[in-house]
Amino acid sequence: MKKVEQTEQTVVNETSGFIIMHHLASFQDNDLESVVSDYTNESVLVTQDATYKGPGEIKGFFVAFMEHFPKQQTSFTLDKVIVNNELVYIVWHADTPTLEVSFGTDTFIVRHGKIYQQTFAGQMKFIN
């Protein structure tokens, strides 16, 4: 990714914040296995289109999603990070060669060093 910016941050629990920063760095590096390693067999990812359960289904989501975020061709800005114990909330936006995300948001529940639950929603415009 070309650009990563962070404009606001509140941290109450360093462990949860660390896990999410690892997750975002792995995503930005297009390291699929590292992204998936943040989840457990009980993890759930809810998006505006579907619900994914466990690492296998979650990996399937990221395989398709990460295709639109090539390294060195993506501008990703982290607008807000709020960490409150197990709860992590982020707001972001991104521009890629095939996708404009004017508003993206994720909410994470982190337990025992892993992402237990996650929601994702975004205002996305596919290009080409």
Question: What positions do the PLM features span?
Answer:
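Conserved short acidic donor-positioning loop in nucleotide-sugar-dependent glycosyltransferases
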Residues: N30, D49-A50
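Solvent-exposed, amphipathic alpha-helical segments
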Residues: T15-S26
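Short, well-ordered alpha-helical segments enriched in acidic and aromatic residues
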Residues: D29-E42
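A beta-strand edge to alpha-helix "cap/lid" segment located at domain peripheries
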Residues: M1-V11, A25-Q28, V46, K59-N128
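Short active-site-proximal "capping" loops at secondary-structure junctions
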Residues: V44, A50-T51
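Short beta-edge strand/loop motif at the mouth of beta-sheet-based domains
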Residues: T51-G60
